[in-house]
């Protein structure tokens, strides 16, 4: 199997302008994902899909190849799946050979060193058309109905360790067959939920405060 990485990174963040090129621990945010991909020998190509000139320049200097993302796939209402479909079709039209795409989100810059190797190992077994990473949630969740809180995954007074396990997508990485991405599907019918038991799974950058937290985590777990 041949694996490539695509990192989608549009330039129009409204909550945090310039987020993808903002320095995290001395390196532009997007470069953390580029370097993670380039460091893995299983990856035969690392691409950044973007509409922003500054992201193109920084990503190219970091060693990634650039896919120009049209405006129709870069607006506020454009989905990651539509951008990935465009990128995959672009590469196919160029004659690039690959079977699976590793999707790395620039806003999830911290990943355990061996996570991608382990994920590819799961895909190589041939039982799953895709894979995505999840964290276990320890939160007691519920709904507010008619002014009253109604527990959803627990009962009042229940200990956290007695709750039924629930999980959420952490965005660290996705692996998907190219045929699914051409249908704008990232998680296919046999997608494997890979549980991440590492604090990096909690880092998702959307605000300045998230950057501060990520820098703390880098220094706290720099050897992992």
Predicted stretch roles:
Residues 56, 178-182, 211:
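A generic structural signal for short hydrophobic patches within well-formed alpha-helices
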Residues 42-47, 200-202:
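Short active-site oxyanion
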Residues 43, 96-98, 127-128:
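Short, high-confidence coil segments that cap the C-terminus of an alpha-helix
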Residues 1-17:
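N-terminal nucleotide-binding beta1-loop-alpha1 segment
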Residues 53-102, 114, 118:
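Short phosphate-binding loop-to-helix
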Residues 195, 200-224:
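Hydrophobic helical membrane-anchoring modules
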Residues 82, 109-199:
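Conserved core of the sugar-phosphate nucleotidyltransferase
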